[in-house]
A protein has these predicted regions:
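ATP-binding/phosphotransfer module of carbohydrate and carboxylate kinases, centering on a glycine-rich
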Residues: 1-69, 73-77, 82-157, 219, ...
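Phosphate-binding/catalytic loop of phosphoryl-transfer enzymes
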Residues: 93, 151-153, 157-164, 168-285, ...
Length: 401
């Protein structure tokens, strides 16, 4: 009869195998190109026989595929390995002010399908928003399955749905506590959408800015940077060594409510002079003298065709530079990643922004501030939501064997 010590040892060995498998699977996923078993052994520090056994299990499960053997200069030919992108997929759904967007992503990060439709969410009938969102998700799942079937996988695993919300959600993951831009307060949208879809275990919801950060972390592995995004307001996050630092309440990096002028305009948060009071969608529309329904790209275009365009660029560039410099000085990091419509705004304010950063950011004493634009400025949140659905497979691929 097996004793307690034998059972404990078996559990330890099983846990070790699971950790090693996750390590190897993650290396295949992050390689950017096909890798061999020998490459994985060298990168992971595991023995070649151990790596081979782990890879064989992943191949048998359909999570990893082998390519044609490639002859090397020395030794046996190498068999390239890569993730089977059609093995499973997840869906990200983003609820925005005037639009609802959904994207389906395969295991290897490729977008399998995307769709969106225009809807004035704040003024729309609430039940209509629920029904239309559910219909969008169902249609996208069908499209993703067809793409996977065309790629040779007839029964891909559906990893579920992640919802991106421009606001705060309750810990019960059923209620949106506050999404001012949608005019939603204490709205049980998460619960109602889950019920409409019939999804239970495969449904999650997060703040849109948090999900956008997740996308950027994947694009900048292991790096430290300040993430700043604009969709309706100004949001941000702190990433240290590839990990999002949330702070005590999960609000770390909320640069939008950094005060840049204590005598400045009133912000929607009730405080004066926040950077959001200058750079929010509403603030830019009012400054450009356009209607509240005007698309942000048109708003920015109108703003800088104005006779006062140079003055506007100088003021907005300087104020954003002050906010960024303050944050960089506190965090002692040198990189900023901009997303959302800040990417569209950047060419117009780049000069005064750079000048302010040079004069105020302490990092310039030993280097310079690296200012980057997101590669997916308008879709970072929904793509991050897709990434969130894939996480369970990468965290523990052994569960999917």
């Amino acid at each position: 009869m097996e004793g307690a010590s034998e059972r404990l040892e078996g559990m330890r060995q099983g846990n070790l195998r699971h950790r090693n498998m996750a390590r190897v699977f993650g290396l295949i996923g992050s390689a950017g190109a096909a890798v061999s078993r020998a490459d994985l052994a060298a990168a992971s520090g595991l023995t070649k026989p151990t790596v081979s056994k782990l890879v064989d299990s992943l191949v048998q499960a359909g999570l990893v595929v082998e390519g044609e053997a490639v002859a090397g200069v020395m030794g046996r030919p190498k068999i390239p390995l890569q993730l089977e992108g059609y093995a499973c997929f997840g869906v990200g759904l983003e609820i925005m002010w005037k639009r609802i967007r959904a994207v389906a992503m395969g295991l290897d990060g490729r977008v399998l399908a995307r769709n969106e439709f225009a809807l004035d969410v704040p003024s729309a009938d609430y039940r209509e928003v629920v029904r239309e969102s559910a219909a969008l998700v169902r249609g996208l799942r069908d499209s993703a399955r067809r793409v996977c079937a065309a790629g040779g996988v007839d029964a891909p695993r559906d990893l579920g749905l992640c919802l991106a919300i421009p606001g705060r959600t309750d810990s019960d993951e059923e209620t949106i506590l506050s999404a001012p831009i949608l005019d939603w307060f204490d709205v049980p949208f998460i619960r109602d959408l889950r019920d409409e879809l019939g999804d239970e275990e495969t449904f999650s919801a997060f703040n849109d800015n948090q999900l956008a950060v997740l996308f950027e972390v994947h694009e900048h592995p292991g790096e430290s940077f300040l993430f700043v995004s604009a969709s309706t307001g100004i949001g941000g996050a702190v990433v240290l060594d590839g990990h999002v630092y949330g702070g005590l309440n999960g609000w770390a990096g909320e640069i939008g409510h950094t005060v840049v002028d204590r005598h400045g305009p009133l912000c929607r948060c009730g405080r004066q002079g926040c950077i959001e009071a200058y750079l929010s969608r509403k603030a830019l529309q009012e400054r450009a003298g356009v209607a509240s329904t005007t698309h942000i790209a048109e708003t920015i275009g109108a703003l800088f065709q104005d006779p006062d365009a140079q003055e506007t660029a100088g003021e907005l560039g300087e104020l954003l530079g002050i906010a960024l410099s303050n944050a960089l000085n506190v965090l002692d990091i040198n990189k900023v990643v901009l997303a959302g419509y800040l990417v569209d705004l950047l060419p117009h304010i780049a000069g005064p922004l750079a000048e302010t950063l040079r004069g105020r950011a302490l990092v310039n004493e030993v280097g310079e501030v690296a200012l980057e634009a997101s590669e997916a400025p308008g879709e970072a949140s929904v793509l991050g939501a897709c990434r969130m659905t894939l996480r369970p497979v990468f965290d523990n691929p052994a569960q999917w064997l």
